[in-house]
């Protein structure tokens, strides 16, 4: 219930749904809107691929909670009217699916200085986000790279050989009909399910998780995973 407890306390919440429903980020908007009586604001494929249509739709739509990938909000920041002055009801941003760059975080904080902006982190294999942190000027000043937050309830984060390991009940059992890949990625720690994220990272004394890049050849584009070796091979 942490999603509802942390982010869904806005009455009559109008929640943006940017992600495709085949993308795990979509559950951030879909299920909280259903369980809290909010309204789901869906964008058409044309609106997400045509900037003119996108900006027109946003300028005539009331949104309270914005849920998207960082790259999508970066696109929207190209519109001069995407500001707190023009969108006073937009009071919360929840970003996930790829790294939030410091540049994008600074631009968003400048455009919406009163909004609550959260950077979240978590792979599909751990049922979505497993950590989050509120973006502030102080946080950005103190860090060269935007941190990815503190662990959510039921999640234990570890660093093993510089890799972020997720431990807890949110970790999946494995990949469907792919035992070889399952064996490579999933294991147990003290009898609890654990997952190799493939992300390099560190955890500070106060529990803050920081992302330090990939330890393999995988990159993310608009939230989707791309294996560079597959591109080279094909």
Positions of the model-derived regions?
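Short, well-ordered beta-strand segments
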Residues: 14-16, 22, 28, 41, ...
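Alpha-helix capping/helix-boundary segments
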Residues: 71-73, 100, 171
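Conserved AMP-binding
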Residues: 19-23, 46-47, 71, 124
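Conserved AMP-binding/adenylation subdomain of ANL enzymes
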Residues: 1-14, 24-64
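Gly/Ser/Thr-rich phosphate-binding loop
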Residues: 35-39, 63-67, 77-143, 156
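AMP-dependent adenylate-forming
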Residues: 116-119, 134-234
